[in-house]
């Protein structure tokens, strides 16, 4: 079974206890709200444009810039030097680390961005975790809800793993890069330093790190990065 340590470098972050206490890395998704309710102390240290909306129960650390037209619901915690760009929509239950970008027309809910993670343009990040240094190409969508509305079942090594979650987007390990208009199906666990090529739809499953994932017709092909 993949562990949080296989995917993320969370040492020294204030979320470390939550990751360490999770038997399975996706279990963190069900704990974000309670964690924020326990630890978040609302305060605005950064800069908020007059046309942006920042609701109560939000913490913005030093150097955070919220651009025109952005909308941030609580509970949300945003770390030092991060940017919430024009037209971004953060729907609460979100932790954004230091030096991150929530970009133009990007929607985020019940998610974690570890330090340096970027979703710069037209992305959807729902019920997902982005590891350190992850970069989502424009138009990347991390789908989080099955059409049949049942629990997300992970398919890995011939096993069916019931995650217990009706909504589960993707866990993208440290350094994952996605190409423009790529999509992950509900319940994707992608190991560190993978590349997902543009226009690729990645099926539900667990993928080892240091691979290239690309579509060939309706099939997904993976190969080791050189």
Regions found by a protein language model. Name each.
Residues 31-77:
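Long amphipathic N-terminal alpha/beta scaffold segment
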Residues 15-19, 104, 110-116, 120-226:
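Glycine-rich hexapeptide-repeat left-handed beta-helix
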Residues 55-56, 61, 73-74, 92, ...:
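Short loop/turn microsegments at loop-to-beta-strand junctions
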Residues 59, 77, 95, 171, ...:
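ABC ATPase A-loop
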Residues 66-68, 72-77, 82-112, 116-121, ...:
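Extended, compositionally simple hydrophobic/Ser/Thr-rich segments
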Residues 3-23, 57, 69, 75, ...:
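N-terminal short leaders/motifs
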Residues 1-51, 193, 208-226:
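Terminal amphipathic alpha-helical/low-complexity segments used for targeting or macromolecular assembly
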């Amino acid at each position: 079974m993949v562990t949080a340590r296989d995917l993320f470098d969370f040492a020294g972050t204030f979320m470390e206890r939550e990751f360490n206490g999770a038997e399975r890395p996706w279990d963190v998704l069900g704990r974000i709200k309670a964690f924020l309710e326990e630890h978040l102390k609302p305060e605005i240290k950064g800069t908020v444009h007059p046309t942006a909306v920042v609701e109560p129960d939000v913490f913005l650390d030093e150097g955070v810039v919220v651009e025109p037209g952005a909308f941030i619901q609580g509970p949300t915690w945003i770390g030092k030097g991060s940017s919430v760009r024009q037209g971004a929509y953060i729907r609460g239950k979100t932790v954004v680390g230091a030096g991150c970008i929530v970009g133009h027309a990007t929607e985020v809910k019940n998610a974690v961005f570890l330090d340096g993670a970027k979703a710069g343009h037209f992305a959807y990040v729902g019920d997902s975790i982005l590891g350190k240094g992850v970069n989502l190409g424009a138009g990347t969508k991390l789908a989080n809800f099955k059409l049949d509305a049942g629990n997300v079942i992970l398919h890995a090594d011939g096993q069916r793993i019931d995650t217990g979650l009706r909504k589960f987007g993707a866990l993208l390990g440290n350094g994952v890069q996605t190409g423009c208009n790529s999509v992950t199906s509900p319940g994707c666990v992608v190991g560190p330093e993978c590349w997902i090529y543009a226009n690729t739809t990645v099926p539900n499953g667990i993928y080892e790190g240091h691979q290239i994932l690309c579509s060939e017709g309706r099939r997904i092909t993976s190969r080791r990065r050189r």
